Amino acid sequence: MNTITIVCSTRKIDENYVNHVKKSFSHPKNQYIFIENNGDKSLTQVYNEGIGQSTNDIVVFIHDDLEFETKNLTPKIIKLFDKNPEYGIIGLAGTNSLISGQWWEKRESMQGQVGHINGNKKYISKYSDSFGDKIKEVVIIDGLFMMIHKNRVKHNFDTRFEGFHFYDLPICLLNHLDGVKVGVTTKIKLYHKSIGMTDKKWLKNKLFFEALYEKHLSLIHI
């Protein structure tokens, strides 16, 4: 298999962004699934629909506000999974210790590197050194760019979580607890046109997540 599926949930499909994504992944036979969602469905629902529609083993979930620095992404992503068959989920940033629903709470446990754009400012958040060709095992990854091998994971997105928050933590944690490796790579460079947002909906999901997994949180570390 030399193609992958890319899934993006967005309020309104922007053809310029679609073209940027296609150019960055650099494979005309990839499957691109852009789903318009004004909030009628949770991100967990939309992403599970993407998995259901996918015709490839590897499914990449992306935010709709990314600027890709790395090009020709498709073969790079396939190579990551081919060389690391024990991994089912790979991202660009994460943590190897989880003590609450705020995964970035322990700065010293964070791994990976992600670029950000905030107004006119463009910078890279280096949570750790580069790993080169290696993958660093973590417990949780940030969902801005999630690569999933659907035949290796044992759990899909948890639809008990509503809205646009906490779609990433439960799927990573459940798979980690079931022996599926979750990892971070520094081989892919991009910029996120957002610095994240924690609002009342985020807090509601955070408390729900912590209630569900309270017995695991203090024990989860690699």
Regions found by a protein language model. Give the residues of each.
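Short aromatic/hydrophobic "clamp" motif used to bind/position activated sugar donors
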Residues: 59
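Active-site donor/metal-binding and catalytic loop motifs
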Residues: 183-204, 208
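N-proximal low-complexity "stem/linker" segments adjacent to membrane-targeting elements
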Residues: 1-31
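A recurrent flexible, glycine/aromatic-enriched loop bordering the glycosyltransferase active site
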Residues: 123-148
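Glycine-rich, basic loop-to-helix element that forms the pyrophosphate-binding segment
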Residues: 40-54
